[in-house]
Amino acid sequence: MDFGKRISIEAVEEGNEFMPKFDDRGLIPVITMEESSNLVLMHGYLNKEALKLSIETKQAHYWSRSREQLWKKGETSGLYQNIKEILVDDDQDCVIFKVEVEGSGASCHVGYKSCFYRSVENFKDLEFVEEEKLFDPEGVYAGQENPTKL
């Protein structure tokens, strides 16, 4: 599978061909949303291989910047993200995956449904908007390095 060649602004903005624009590291950001509710589940990155695999298999694959490797969401946890729709923005430098999540429906490695489980109150303090974890990350990811970096 090859993506379209970016030959004109008009073709990128108004055309019918998918011509994703990857950054200088070969990545494009992706926002992943629950199809049924439009809840934002996570933000990640795709390289060409991850995007191609996601399209071909209809299961979300991502590029991990912290581990510098391709990963299929749900491979360890069983919480696979089945892609129902892919949207692209006007200049094709960001995509949205609308997904249905298997199992408990969680997408966050911390155990919550959404990685956006806290809101910023008063522009400085964090308040939990999700209070209940849908799975125990210690049980699911035992022995694996936490992907969060300081």
Annotate the PLM regions.
Residues 2-27, 34-41, 46-150:
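C-terminal binding/interaction regions
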